[in-house]
């Protein structure tokens, strides 16, 4: 993994009215890192991801992307093309085929011509095992298939960083494995990824950096071995014990 910082979060805060959801968050992501953010529901994990993608506007602090404070950016679509997000609810266009779903962002944001967009879309749909379904509409697909299309769509945009917001939480249990395998294969390509997940075995296997959040703060971060085998924070220990017991 590189020591080059891609994303640096400094003193990040986010409140919804009186409810402070993120409380002075500080951590950084190096190029090539696969970072898994874990913690109980309501700990602020998804809000943090949405702030990084500017879907939520932070209340305070800085988010540096390649050294630039993105909270001062004037071109949010260009930034989001570099820091793409895979949503738990897929966010596919229901009226478009699988192929069109993977082409439209390239054409509108990257200004790719039709042939180039189609070539890239086909390449990544093949990679996630969805090439046979290029003419299908999302309603004809299973949840696992929809998520694989959503991942291919993001990969086709050639992003610098990919954010995954609980990518398996909306799936039937039998579909979870196929999506996790796709994400593992992407991690092996050396892409920079931040993954919010409740899948502890997956987090341990796929990441080189684990962040544990509790009640809007980062309690602890480290390598998977440090977090899963020798956690220091009492909240981390309690959280992992609950998972082991379940």
Model-derived regions: residue spans:
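A short, proline-enriched helix->beta-strand linker immediately N-terminal to the Walker B motif
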Residues: 156-160
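Catalytic Walker B motif of ABC-type/P-loop ATPase nucleotide-binding domains
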Residues: 162-165
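ABC ATPase NBD coupling module
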Residues: 70-84, 114-115, 188, 230-231
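Helix-to-loop junction immediately C-terminal to a conserved catalytic motif
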Residues: 53
């Amino acid at each position: 993994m590189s020591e080059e910082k891609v994303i640096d979060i400094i003193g990040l805060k986010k409140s919804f009215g009186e409810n402070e959801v993120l409380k002075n968050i500080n951590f950084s992501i190096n190029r090539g890192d696969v970072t898994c953010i874990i913690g109980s529901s309501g700990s602020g994990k998804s809000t943090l991801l949405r702030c990084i993608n500017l879907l939520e506007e932070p209340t305070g602090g800085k988010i540096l992307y390649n050294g630039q404070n993105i909270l001062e950016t004037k071109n949010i679509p260009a930034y989001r093309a570099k820091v793409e997000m895979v949503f738990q609810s897929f966010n596919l266009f229901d009226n478009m085929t699988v192929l069109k779903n993977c082409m439209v962002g390239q054409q509108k944001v990257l200004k790719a011509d039709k042939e180039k967009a189609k070539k890239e879309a086909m390449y990544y749909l093949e990679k996630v095992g969805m090439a046979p379904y290029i003419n299908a509409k999302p309603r004809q697909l299973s949840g696992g298939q929809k998520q694989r299309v959503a991942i291919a769509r993001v990969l086709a945009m050639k992003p610098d960083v990919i954010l995954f917001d609980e990518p398996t939480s909306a799936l039937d249990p039998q579909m979870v494995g196929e999506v996790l395998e796709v994400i593992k294969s992407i991690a092996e390509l050396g892409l920079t990824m931040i993954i919010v997940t409740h899948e502890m075995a997956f987090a341990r296997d796929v990441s080189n950096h684990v962040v544990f959040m509790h009640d809007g703060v980062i309690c602890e971060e480290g390598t998977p071995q440090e977090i899963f085998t020798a956690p220091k924070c009492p909240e981390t220990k309690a959280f992992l014990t609950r998972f082991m017991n379940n």
